[in-house]
């Protein structure tokens, strides 16, 4: 059942998709992060979106 309400889609994207993933340990970090919260690596990438 897909979400059709644009307001709910925006909330979903903000809460689930707008993250950075550490390439070293796989931890999820906020988009504003420059270093990983778990291992302090600077090797971060944006989470892939379908």
Curated annotation (Swiss-Prot):
Q: Name one GO cellular component term.
A: ribonucleoprotein complex
Q: Which family does it belong to?
A: Belongs to the eukaryotic ribosomal protein eL40 family.
- The UniProt gene name for this protein comes to rpl40e
Source domain of life: Archaea
What organism does this protein naturally occur in? Aeropyrum pernix (strain ATCC 700893 / DSM 11879 / JCM 9820 / NBRC 100138 / K1)
Would the keyword Hydrolase be found if you checked this record's keyword annotation? no
Question: This chain belongs to which protein, by name?
Answer: Large ribosomal subunit protein eL40
Upper classification of the source organism reads: Archaea, Thermoproteota, Thermoprotei, Desulfurococcales, Desulfurococcaceae
Which HAMAP family does the UniProt entry name for this protein? Ribosomal_eL40
NCBIfam families, sorted = PRK04136.1 (NF003161)
Arranged from A to Z, the UniProt key words for this protein are: Ribonucleoprotein, Ribosomal protein
Q: Disulfide bond: is it a keyword of this entry? A: no
Q: Which PANTHER family match?
A: 50S RIBOSOMAL PROTEIN L40E, LARGE RIBOSOMAL SUBUNIT PROTEIN EL40
| Entry GO MF terms | structural constituent of ribosome
Question: What biological-process terms (Gene Ontology) are attached?
Answer: translation
